[in-house]
Amino acid sequence: MSYRLKLTITISLLIAISFGIGGTLMITTSFNATLKQETQSALSSFESVQNMLYLLNSLGDQSDYESLADALSQMETQGLGRWQALTLKNSEEELFRSGSAELLNYSLPVPAPDQCSYLPVADDQGHGLIVRSLISAGETDLQLQARFDVSHIYEIRAAQQKQYFIVYIAVVFF
């Protein structure tokens, strides 16, 4: 093999490797930024629900949980709730549930009152974000837990990786 051919092949492979590393970093960076943005959006939506429940609880009788459940039901009916599943419980009973209870079968650390904890999950239902908080309601605490669907981000990443792989193969072989 001539020196010129070896040099051409070596430079082509270096370009392909650089292209591969650069593209992978670009997809990963884009995915992480989108996931962070979607997490912030889900947390913001959760905080809106939480603040609405605080407001209703402070305006009415703190033991009247039916008004809280009605408000959540109205939000769901009007399409204002972005959640995939949501529960509101006190220590004795479940006050409101939307969606499948299986979607919320994850143990999260119990947050301090007026704060929330969250956990990204992946299961048969796709990828999601579980968020949990405690709401002070008089002498008892209400537990609000929701799951938000983030599967579409992972689907976009898989499609980008597939397209990139095809382009990468084309660069390597041509």
Q: What are these language model-derived features?
A:
Residues 86-88, 130, 142-146, 153:
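Hydrophobic beta-strand residues in large extracellular and virion-surface proteins
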